[in-house]
């Protein structure tokens, strides 16, 4: 159908659907500063080939969705200053997007920040989430999921000026946080960086998203109340969200499956796709089996 925009939860959200409109709805939620195209086009088509109606979107403050306002101060979140918006607000965006599309409930997969949003969606709107796949994310617990200090300069450094500097910075960053056990596809990453730049770079928006993360409370107790099929996927070599975050998430959600991937960092290289696609499909099928049993 191509990209569309809608007023969602008082925010202009850009979204796209891929696959059979009558297919199983699958909402894909991307991470920090990542537009919907970070869900690779080919990956989305492969998921559509499994019978899913794939829905991807730019989170607020990212890509072609609305840039928000408000000053975000990272240290302020640790001093309990209220953020410009919260993970709950971002989760509500997703719920209202489903409303806009006429979808009562969906299978939901989120990556990194997207995993946190997806968890929050399941907590706040449990009737909207048929199954949950949380990828390279964490619970918000203060003792798990912390980044390796060596990658922080790549994330918190000075913003690159201009297109080529941005592309170079993206390549350098993903060489640091990416998957050492899988080939680094420079051409694919460069193409993605170009497309991301063309959608618009919102450095202030990324900081506001980051403050939404650091301001959030530990979700572990609320995750324990979930009663949906869940899969947690995490790379054993993730330097940005330590694998302890994935383990904690799987411990918190009753009956969750934990998939730890050797050599996977904080990205989704093509070599991980088969396991990811199978995992999403398998978890969705568990939801169908549970619904039929009840």
Predicted segments — roles?
Residues 206-222:
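Active-site nucleophile elbow and catalytic-triad environment of alpha/beta-hydrolase enzymes
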Residues 226, 232-234:
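Short beta-strand/loop motif that positions the catalytic acidic residue
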Residues 237-241:
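Acidic catalytic loop of the alpha/beta-hydrolase fold
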Residues 123, 132-161:
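Flexible "cap/lid" loop of the alpha/beta hydrolase fold
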